[in-house]
């Protein structure tokens, strides 16, 4: 009995802890429940590869997945559509423009050295580029208008010409974004602006040292190009003329805000796209769909749960009421587990949760039927309850293990919503195993051992029991 009291205390503590978790860590909802951004990205062929094949599409999809993961979006969906398109769903994203900038940019980073004898021409071209960048930024902030649209188109063409002119003043040195191991936004030393801190691999660190050594003290710039756009052109001091900048680290400075620095860092961490892409659709999934889905799901789940609770109480009497209490404990513990693990609830995920409730009920049904068989065989109520749990254990364990194996296969080979379904079902199955074999058993045995009137009235467990010798 002492052991049962400790188990009962453990159950109470778990329920209180789970309730606290649910208050402090609200459940995350997926795109279909709370809205977000959905982008359709079209992969563009090149002169070298005029036809996009499946391998090319998968390569682009992998890079986009890396960028999405770097964004920190929970339960994203990235999947191919047709021969040259990729659909990206980002739950909870409130700035689809940022998502388009990060996912749509090729992000081909390259470090180049300025050619000797081009100092004067570079200063003139770089000044023009900065003026164009400033005017472009002002136009974008001022919003769309017919006049702005025409001027914006002119500025974009002028910037393309400026980029070509600047690119001709530099020469590649073989140092690209492929040599990066990390990229993070960070404030500069004065704390007044933002920059992007880079970390190179061993080969990249050596190349960066050679590149900085080549331009150190010459007055020529080290060009940092992103998609052939010169984003930074620092001059390396003469103190690095002998060894270059060693250590395998560098920073990209420029006119960065915290948002633009983070966007660039995310792109660089995700890797460059092997093909140019175009975002052909960028739409926001409204909250109305999410609210309607939540309402219908909650109604369906509530009605189903009430019917199950009523059936268990009517058909199984006292054990059924105990099972109902266990089911409520199960619901609290499972939702808390979802919050702790970071599960994002989608409609398929809710379906997995409801299915796991059915499996929890099934476990209790097996236990109570075995208990009734023991009572009909003439055993005492206490022994019948213990034997019922013991005899049902192997069947319950087998069914739950096979379900978990299926969940593992779905999670391993599936993607997106299928993974969400598998994860919620697996968590629900594991929690249901605990509640059925621990919570239900503990509550029943405490009632039987603590209440003599219950112990002497086995018909509370088996209504049509003819006669049973009630023993303490």
Swiss-Prot record:
GO molecular function: protein-transporting ATPase activity
Protein name stated in the entry: Protein translocase subunit SecD
Family: Belongs to the SecD/SecF family. SecD subfamily.
Gene name in the database record: secD
KW Membrane (keyword) present: yes
Function text: Part of the Sec protein translocase complex. Interacts with the SecYEG preprotein conducting channel. SecDF uses the proton motive force (PMF) to complete protein translocation after the ATP-dependent function of SecA. Probably participates in protein translocation into and across both the cytoplasmic and thylakoid membranes in cyanobacterial cells.
Native source organism of the sequence: Synechocystis sp. (strain ATCC 27184 / PCC 6803 / Kazusa)
An individual GO BP term: protein transport by the Sec complex
GO CC term (a single one): plasma membrane
Regions that span the bilayer: 7-27, 298-318, 326-345, 349-368, 392-414, 432-452
């Amino acid at each position: 009995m002492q052991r049962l009291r400790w188990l009962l205390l453990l159950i109470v503590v778990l329920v209180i802890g789970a309730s606290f978790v649910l208050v402090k860590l609200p459940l995350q909802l997926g795109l279909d429940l709370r809205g977000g951004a959905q982008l359709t990205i079209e992969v563009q062929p090149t002169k070298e590869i005029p036809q996009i094949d499946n391998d090319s599409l998968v390569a682009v999809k992998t890079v986009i997945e890396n960028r999405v993961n770097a964004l920190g979006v929970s339960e994203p969906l990235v999947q191919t559509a047709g021969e040259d398109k990729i659909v990206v769903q980002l739950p909870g994203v409130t700035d689809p423009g940022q998502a388009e900038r990060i996912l749509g940019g090729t992000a081909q980073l390259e470090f180049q050295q300025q050619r000797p004898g081009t100092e004067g021409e570079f200063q003139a071209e770089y000044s023009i580029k900065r003026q164009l960048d400033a005017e472009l930024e002002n136009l974008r902030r001022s919003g769309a208008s017919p006049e702005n649209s025409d001027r914006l188109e002119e500025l974009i063409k002028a910037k393309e010409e400026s980029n070509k002119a600047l690119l001709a003043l530099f020469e590649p040195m073989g140092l690209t974004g492929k040599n990066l191991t990390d990229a993070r936004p960070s404030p500069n030393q004065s704390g007044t602006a933002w920059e992007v801190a880079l970390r190179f691999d061993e080969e990249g660190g050596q190349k960066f040292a050679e590149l900085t050594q080549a331009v150190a003290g010459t007055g020529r710039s080290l060009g940092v190009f992103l998609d052939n756009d010169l984003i930074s052109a620092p001059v390396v001091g003469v103190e690095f003329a002998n060894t270059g900048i060693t250590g395998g680290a560098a920073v990209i400075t420029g006119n960065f805000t915290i948002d633009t620095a983070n966007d660039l860092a995310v792109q660089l961490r995700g890797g460059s796209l092997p093909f140019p892409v175009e975002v052909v659709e960028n739409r926001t999934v409204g909250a109305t769909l999410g609210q309607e889905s939540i309402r219908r799901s909650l109604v369906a789940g509530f009605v189903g749960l009430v019917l199950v609770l009523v059936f268990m109480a009517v058909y199984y009497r006292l054990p059924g009421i105990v099972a109902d209490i266990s089911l409520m404990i199960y619901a609290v513990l499972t939702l808390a587990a979802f919050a702790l693990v970071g599960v994002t609830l989608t409609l398929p995920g809710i379906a997995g949760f409801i299915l796991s409730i059915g499996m929890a009920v099934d476990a209790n049904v097996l236990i109570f039927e075995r208990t009734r068989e023991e009572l009909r065989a003439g055993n005492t109520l206490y022994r019948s309850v213990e034997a019922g749990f013991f005899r049902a254990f192997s069947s319950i364990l087998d069914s739950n293990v096979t379900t978990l194996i299926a969940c593992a296969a779905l999670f391993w080979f599936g993607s997106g919503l299928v993974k969400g379904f598998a994860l919620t079902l697996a968590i629900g199955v594991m929690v249901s195993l605990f509640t059925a074999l621990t919570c239900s058993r503990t509550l029943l045995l405490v009632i039987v051992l603590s209440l003599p009137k219950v112990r002497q009235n086995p018909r509370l467990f088996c209504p049509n029991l003819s006669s049973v010798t009630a023993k303490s």
